[in-house]
């Protein structure tokens, strides 16, 4: 099932009003067909991490393919009293006709490098800004957070259980998609399972136990219905004195006589490290060594790391609010900035300056490469002018923007261009990967390319974004021009 089957709303008006007023201004100026290039990039990894994960591209493709203004949209814009009738007629026939390049969904990404480039008539490029940023900012944030949690779990299963704490239904469903890209094994959100084919998982709520006269009746009835799929929630009254002993009793009296086994128990409160060790001992003593222990309750990468460090016996984690809201750093910060304007047959680079050095943009049309050592590790990313070429194994001079006086040379390296054609003249020109392929791509990069030092949570190694000498000089010339 595609995303469009989940969401049938018209989203042409999912744009900031100033995009519309600027578009109207370009139209009235007779500049509607001026070709420009915009870049999508972000400035800082969430949680001071070593990298982020790019997600949300499939939804952007669907949006571009379906983008048009309905009669109702036009009527609403007319009611604002801001726009001329010729402009509204232009919008009535609006379709995206430009070019888009993007890094593959699931790519490991770093600050200040272009993730998406849009080259199109100025109005088209302007009107799609808000939607592109909405998708990139949300899904990249959640995918990145999910991957931190998955890495903390060290191979133990992680389930997304955050829908009820998400900021709305879109955040719940698309958040589940992004979390799956980031590496979680399953989701508790049935709609996300239907929409994207994500494996779904569920146990029981405290209300099931409270509905019956006691834990024994609740567990017994559940076991009679679900057999070896049963996972009992054991902390409704007292985990060690009541919940686990009752779960063991039902396993012995109901499941084992039927040739079935208790799949697991879930702890949703208390000291997870302490309780999981005690629960494991009780289960093992009862001959239920194969019964899994699941933990939930406000978990994230830090609490999971702590549980494991203390010798906790948790086999799987259900992670909710701190995943689906990216609780510890709830912003991604991607922006959309003008990079070049076409004048005649050439693109003139544009730069945004700032008193804050971190907000000075990288101007012009550019290429982005990932640079690999002879052993296949990613050692840096490289921005060049779009007219420059690199060759595997050949020397290539570069510099770091932080140390521009030190010109260095890549030697015996291979280069992979990251920005790939997505749309040409408004038409999709590439086959999109499946969700499973995106998820596997994330895992493969982390296993084979990204240094472990970049993956640590505390003080991760910095992955450098270098520039060719020619590109850096062009940027400096532009900055001096605007002094």
Locate the predicted segments by residue:
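Active-site neighborhood of glycoside hydrolase catalytic domains
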Residues: 288, 292
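Buried, small/hydrophobic-residue-enriched core segments of structured protein domains
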Residues: 2-34, 44-46, 82-83, 88-97, ...
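Short amphipathic alpha-helical segments
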Residues: 56-59, 141, 434-438
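Short coil/turn segments at secondary-structure boundaries
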Residues: 75-76, 144-148, 162, 454-461
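Short hydrophobic alpha-helical runs that function as membrane-insertion/retention elements
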Residues: 202, 294, 315-318
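N-terminal, Lys/Arg-enriched amphipathic/low-complexity engagement segments
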Residues: 36-92
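Gly/Ser/Thr/Ala-enriched C-terminal appendages of enzymes
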Residues: 2-34, 38, 47-49, 299-483
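Alpha-helix initiation/capping motif
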Residues: 16, 56, 69-73, 83-85, ...
């Amino acid at each position: 099932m595609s995303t469009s089957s989940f969401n049938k709303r018209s989203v042409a008006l999912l744009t900031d009003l100033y995009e519309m007023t600027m578009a109207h201004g370009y139209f009235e100026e007779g500049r509607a067909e001026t070709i420009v290039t915009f870049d999508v990039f972000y400035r800082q990894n969430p949680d001071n991490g070593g990298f982020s994960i790019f997600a949300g591209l499939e939804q952007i493709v669907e949006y571009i393919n379906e983008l048009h203004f309905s009669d109702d949209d036009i009527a609403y814009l007319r009611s604002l009293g801001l726009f001329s009738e010729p402009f509204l007629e232009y919008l009535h026939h609006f379709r995206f006709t430009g070019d888009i390049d993007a890094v593959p969904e699931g790519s490991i990404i770093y600050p200040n490098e272009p993730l998406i480039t849009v080259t199109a008539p100025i109005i088209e490029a302007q009107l799609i800004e808000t939607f592109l940023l909405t998708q990139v900012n949300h899904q990249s944030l959640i995918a990145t957070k999910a991957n931190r949690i998955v890495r903390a779990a060290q191979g133990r299963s992680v389930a997304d259980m955050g829908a009820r704490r998400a900021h709305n239904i879109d955040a719940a469903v698309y958040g589940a998609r992004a979390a799956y890209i980031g590496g979680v094994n399953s989701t508790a959100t049935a709609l996300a399972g239907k929409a994207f084919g994500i494996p779904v998982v569920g146990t029981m709520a405290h209300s099931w136990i409270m509905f019956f006269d006691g834990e024994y009746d609740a567990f017994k009835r559940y076991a009679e219905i679900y057999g070896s799929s049963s996972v009992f929630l054991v902390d409704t009254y007292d985990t060690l004195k009541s919940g686990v002993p009752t779960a063991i009793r039902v396993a012995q009296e109901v499941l084992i006589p039927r040739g079935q086994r208790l799949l697991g128990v879930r702890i949703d409160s208390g000291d997870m490290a302490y309780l999981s060790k005690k629960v494991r001992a009780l289960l093992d003593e009862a001959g239920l060594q194969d019964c899994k222990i699941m933990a939930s309750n406000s978990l994230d990468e830090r609490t999971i790391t702590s549980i494991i460090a203390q010798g906790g016996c948790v086999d799987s984690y259900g992670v909710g609010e701190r995943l689906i809201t990216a609780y510890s750093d709830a912003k991604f910060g991607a922006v959309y900035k003008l990079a070049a304007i076409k004048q005649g047959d050439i693109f003139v680079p544009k730069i945004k300056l700032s008193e804050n050095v971190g907000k000075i943009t990288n101007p012009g049309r550019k290429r982005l490469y990932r640079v690999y050592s002879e052993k296949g590790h990613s050692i840096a990313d490289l921005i060049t002018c779009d007219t420059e070429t690199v060759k595997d194994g050949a020397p290539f001079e570069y510099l770091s923007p932080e140390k521009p006086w030190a010109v260095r040379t890549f030697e015996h390296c291979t280069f992979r261009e990251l920005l790939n054609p997505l749309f040409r003249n408004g038409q999709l020109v590439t086959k999109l990967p499946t969700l499973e392929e995106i998820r596997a791509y994330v895992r493969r990069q982390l296993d084979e390319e990204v240094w472990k030092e970049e993956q640590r949570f505390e003080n991760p190694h910095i992955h450098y974004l270098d520039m060719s000498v020619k590109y850096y000089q062009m940027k400096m010339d532009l900055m001096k021009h605007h002094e």
